[in-house]
Amino acid sequence: MGLLEKIFGTYSDREVKRIIPLVDKIDALDGSMQALSEDELKAKTAEFKQRYENGETLDDLLVEAFAVVREASSRILGLKHFREQIIGGIVLHQGRISEMKTGEGKTLVATLPSYLNAITGKGVHVVTVNDYLAKRDMEWMGQLYQYLGLTTGVIVHDLDQKQRQEAYAADITYGTNNEFGFDYLRDNMVIYKEERVQRPLHFCIVDEVDSILIDEARTPLIISGEGEKSTEFYKVADNFAKMLRKEKDFTIDEKTNSAILTDEGVEKAEKYYHIDNYADPQNMEIQHHTSQALKANYLMKRDKDYMVKEDEVVIVDEFTGRLMEGRRYSDGLHQAIEAKEGVKVQKESKTLATITFQNYFRMYEKLSGMTGTALTEEVEFREIYGLDVVVIPTHRPIARIDAPDIVYKTELGKFKAVVEDIVETNKNGQPVLVGTVSIEKSELLSSLLKKRGVRHQVLNAKYHEQEAEIISHAGEKGMVTIATNMAGRGTDIKLGEGVTDVGGLKIIGTERHESRRIDNQLRGRAGRQGDKGYSRFYVSLEDDLMRIFGSDKLKNMVEKLGLGDDDAIESKMVSSAIENAQKKVEGNNFDIRKTLIQYDDVMNKQREIIYKQRSEVLEGENLKDQIEGMIKDLIYNAVNSHISGVDEELESDIEAILNYLDDICLPRGIVEVEELATMSNDEIKEKLYSLAKEIYERKEEEFSSDQMRELERVILLRVVDTKWMDHIDSMEHLKQGIGLRAYKQQDPTQAYQMEGSDMFEEMVENIKVETVRYLFHVQAERAPERQRVVKETEINYSGPDAGDTKKEPVRRKEKKIGRNDLCPCGSGKKYKDCCGRRA
């Protein structure tokens, strides 16, 4: 702590001081609230709603509303909010992040701002990390809200559309970040406005906010359809990768987590693939497949990054150690791993809609969050989300002892020491929770403990069904629990009888994570609500963090001391070296996320424009003016771009205009070149536009006026959706190749912004051309029907990419229209003979 902080207190101390007077006012209402009858207390909600409608603000109502929730909670749940919990609730209502230590009752804290903000009738979303917690919190806290006359809903994976609409219509809706994000994307793919499920995004409380807004910030949510590419080439590239020798044919850069061919490797590739120049842009696909095959074979580790289960490759979440069933790595990496493991290689998919969590959560009118560990990422929360972090004081002083790290030379020496520590601790009945970084390490430790005859439970991706159950017993006397990373987060570990007498829960970390926050989360499992507890990390110089990012100074010191495998050192220098290594990685990851958001912002602005236009099409009763505007733009642009201004070329220019418009909206023969050649440019535009309008009026007579309006909607929706999907793919390709611009002294992000903008404008022009073309060619054979461009069939989600510590896309899969299906434009023809011909 610096001198200024000692004198003035930290930022959080000062913010908490400002909130204390409000807490005192809420406290002062305690007696009068207790005196209210059941009916009087319940009637308060209707009173608050009326006062809000009459012009009072939520801040005006805060003191009374919080006091009402506190009293109702005491009566219904038997839990009365502590002063510290009220401070946390006020911070959340203000649209900030409450950092509250584990066991301080975050679930109860959220009831205060949720109730207050639900008074507006605009809905409150409470976001949790998994379906189990969403259901648990909704059922538990729902009793309180229902008592006070508010409705609650929960969004879980297997709900149908009607159930989702009901859940979102509730005053307070619980659910996971994935479900909220997917519903937003799906709402922007509907073909009838009645199919939408979400209301406008009003107020959101994100539980475990660091996990969702930092760890998963770069995870794109993707809804995808099946691609057409063959999967055979993955096997060809896999055979090539398996022939290579490390260091000679390729090198591995562990800091960026990438594998690169050497000159010798490039020569081998040219021979193997029968090509002259591996680096030639024509061979981009070969480079891509080879790069993914190298990644799959030499960077992705089985039982750490993924598991093979029932002949399928299943991703393991690096943050929680859970299996991510049905999720897939994008960009062909999943197929490359399938080829490596010899299981069926599935087809790549085509992206239909996508958004990152960063951009989804920034759309809420007010965003807030709570977690036990946010302060280390305070700068990122402030810069990217405009959220500040306020550390809430604990209800009772923390009694946990955090011992300094112990460092061993080798990993084996470290694990031997961990086992000895567990055996000794277990003798006196003190419960132990051991944190590991992977399934592989959990199982290694488990086998070592079995040899010593120590009874224990293993909690990792293989058994996550019993996760909450196992973790809730971890504080009982004599229990030894091994847990991967942050598995079981959100479930309290309560101490069993007699455990306080033997020192409380003991936490042993078997490796430092690259993020200090995740280490702090593991520590925070012990010593909840002033309980006794103890934590210590065991580290070896062979651990990934120390090997890749550790300082040479530390390694040299260990060499000089001549440490044996089983010898250990414990010093402040070691702890600070570890912390510096972690800061290095955190800083690096923050920079990557900042750069990526610059890229993503380009796509985000474009997405907003397209979704806004789509929404107007769904909502609008009459698109006729918009369609006529498109016809006008199209004709005016055609004239401007074709007429050169050279008199001798005028007739051939007009000929070219008529040829161009013939396929779109003006059949040849409707006007002669000679007639137009006598006119000025403006007169030509007006003449062609009036002719096109006449044809369109006649087209309207073939249908009824209502049918024509519906037809306009059907075709415009279809064209916008198809062009937008293609544009998403094009932007993804642009992003993948843009990094090379740095070699041309170009700023890649600027180049991406400019070229992405040009591509978007081109797409908008193409939407106009295609829409007008379809409308002028459609036949009056049957009433127009809206159909989806794709149908949703399964869910796909991907975890962390081997390439650069980034999280990979959450995917949901959808099916394309078959060539022989009826065309969705309503013509009555087969898709291949109608719109499919031009697709």
Curated annotation (Swiss-Prot):
Annotated catalysed reactions: ATP + H2O + cellular proteinSide 1 = ADP + phosphate + cellular proteinSide 2
Subcellular localization: Cell membrane; Cytoplasm
UniProt keywords, alphabetically: ATP-binding, Cell membrane, Cytoplasm, Membrane, Metal-binding, Nucleotide-binding, Protein transport, Translocase, Translocation, Transport, Zinc
Residues binding Zn(2+), per UniProt: C823, C825, C834, C835
A Pfam entry, by short name: SecA_PP_bind
Cofactor: Zn(2+)
CDD domains named in the record: DEXDc_SecA (cd17928), SF2_C_secA (cd18803)
Binding residue positions for ATP: Q85, G103, E104, G105, K106, T107, D492
InterPro entries: Helicase_ATP-bd (IPR014001), Helicase_C-like (IPR001650), P-loop_NTPase (IPR027417), SEC_C_motif (IPR004027), SecA (IPR000185), SecA_CS (IPR020937), SecA_DEAD (IPR011115), SecA_motor_DEAD (IPR014018)
EC number annotated for this UniProt entry: 7.4.2.8
Cofactor note: May bind 1 zinc ion per subunit.
One annotated Gene Ontology cellular component of this protein: plasma membrane
Membrane topology term: Peripheral membrane protein
HAMAP family attached to this UniProt entry: SecA (MF_01382)
Function: Part of the Sec protein translocase complex. Interacts with the SecYEG preprotein conducting channel. Has a central role in coupling the hydrolysis of ATP to the transfer of proteins into and across the cell membrane, serving as an ATP-driven molecular motor driving the stepwise translocation of polypeptide chains across the membrane.
Subunit (UniProt): Monomer and homodimer. Part of the essential Sec protein translocation apparatus which comprises SecA, SecYEG and auxiliary proteins SecDF. Other proteins may also be involved.
Family statement drawn from the similarity comment of this UniProt entry: Belongs to the SecA family.
Name this protein carries in UniProt: Protein translocase subunit SecA
Species the sequence originates in: Clostridium acetobutylicum (strain ATCC 824 / DSM 792 / JCM 1419 / IAM 19013 / LMG 5710 / NBRC 13948 / NRRL B-527 / VKM B-1787 / 2291 / W)
